[in-house]
Amino acid sequence: MKALAKLERGPGLTLTRVKKPEVGHNDVLIKIRRTAICGTDIHIWKWDDWAQKTIPVPMHVGHEYVGEIVEMGQEVRGFSIGDRVSGEGHITCGFCRNCRAGRRHLCRNTVGVGVNREGAFAEYLAIPAFNAFKIPPEISDDLAAIFDPFGNATHTALSFNLVGEDVLITGAGPIGVMAVAIAKHVGARNVVITDINDYRLELARKMGATRAVNVSRESLRDVMADLHMTEGFDVGLEMSGVPSAFTSLLESMNHGGKVALLGIPPAQTAIDWNQVIFKGLEIKGIYGREMFETWYKMVAMLQSGLDLSPIITHRFAVDDYEKGFAAMLSGESGKVILDWADA
C-alpha cells in the first residue's frame, strides 16, 4: 500500500510503498479517506531533537484521520464493516492503575499511533477496536479528520467551567484557535487570544475571539482595560509552549484563577512562583484527550452548532503532500488536509 514514511534519519518524508497491516483479533482495519497534518508531524518532518529521540526509522507516520472499517478481528464487537470512524491515537495498556480506574488518558504505558508505532498516513491503518470512534453522518470527513487536535482543544478548554468567565488563550496555533470557538460556544464572556502570527490571529477572529492580540504590537493590559476587566482573567489556557507567553498569562490571571497547560515549554523554564502561590492559582497539565468523554463532547458541540470550518484552510491530494507540509511550515495555515481517495 502507499504510505508517507520516515525512511531515513533526516528532514522530510517519502511517499513509498509498505506492507498492508495485519489485523489482530481485537483490531479493526480502516481504509483511510482523509488525514490532517499535525504539529507533531512537523517535528518529525524537521527531524528535530524530539523526533530523533522518539521516532523509529523506517516507519510511516500520521495520527489525524478518518476512514472506513473494511475488516475486523474475530473478537471485535460493536462495529460493522462500512462504519466511518476516526480513532484515539493513544493506545493504552489497560492494566495500570489509571487504566483500571477508567482514567486511560493518564496511562503511563501509552503508545502513540504514528509516533511509536505505524501511523495513519497510509491507505490502511490497523488499530485496536477499543480506540475506534464512530463518526455521525452529519459530520464531514474533513472535520472528522481533525478530531485528534479538536480533542486536545476540547480537553483543555473544558477542564474548567467557562460559563460567564473571562478566558485568556496564549498561542494561536490550530488548537488554540479551536479553543476560542469552544470557549465561546459554551458560554464564556470575553475570550482573548495572544500570538505574534497575524494570519492565525485573523483565524481566531473568524472563530469568535473577543480580541486577538499581537503582543509584539499591542499591550494585553490595554486590551483588558478596553474590555473593562479590572481583576484579571478567570481561566487561562496556555497553548504555545513559549515561556514569555506563560509568564504573561500568569501575570494576567485573577486571584483564584484556573490555568490549563497544553503547550510544551523548554524543560528548565523558570516562572515567578509568587504569581501562582499568592494568587492561589490552580494549574492543570493536559495530555491528549479523555477517553472517551472528550470525544462525546466534540460530537455534541458540533451537533449543537459549533462551527470549526474556518480552521481548515488547505486541502491537497496525498501525492501533493510536500505542498501540504510547506503550507504548515509557512505559518500561514490552519489545519491542512491530505486526501487519500485516489491513493
Swiss-Prot record:
It is an enzyme of class 1 (oxidoreductase). Binds 2 Zn(2+) ions per subunit. InterPro entries: ADH-like_C, ADH-like_N, ADH_Zn_CS, GroES-like_sf, L-Threonine_3-DHase, NAD(P)-bd_dom_sf, PKS_ER, Zn_alcohol_dh. The record marks 148 as: Important for catalytic activity for the proton relay mechanism but does not participate directly in the coordination of zinc atom. Zn(2+) 1 binds at residues 38, 63-64. Pathway: Amino-acid degradation; L-threonine degradation via oxydo-reductase pathway; glycine from L-threonine: step 1/2. It catalyses: L-threonine + NAD(+) = (2S)-2-amino-3-oxobutanoate + NADH + H(+). GO terms for cellular component: cytoplasm. It is found in: Cytoplasm. Its cofactor is Zn(2+). Its EC number is 1.1.1.103. Zn(2+) 2 binds at residues 93, 96, 99, 107. The keyword NAD applies. Gene3D superfamilies: Medium-chain alcohol dehydrogenases, catalytic domain, NAD(P)-binding Rossmann-like Domain. NAD(+) binds at residues 175, 195, 200, 262-264, 286-287. The active site is at 40 (charge relay system), 43 (charge relay system). GO terms for molecular function: L-threonine 3-dehydrogenase activity; zinc ion binding. The keyword Cytoplasm applies. One of its GO terms (biological process) is L-threonine catabolic process to glycine. Keywords: Cytoplasm, Metal-binding, NAD, Oxidoreductase, Zinc. Belongs to the zinc-containing alcohol dehydrogenase family. NCBIfam families: PRK05396.1, tdh. Catalyzes the NAD(+)-dependent oxidation of L-threonine to 2-amino-3-ketobutyrate. This is L-threonine 3-dehydrogenase. It comes from Burkholderia mallei (strain ATCC 23344).
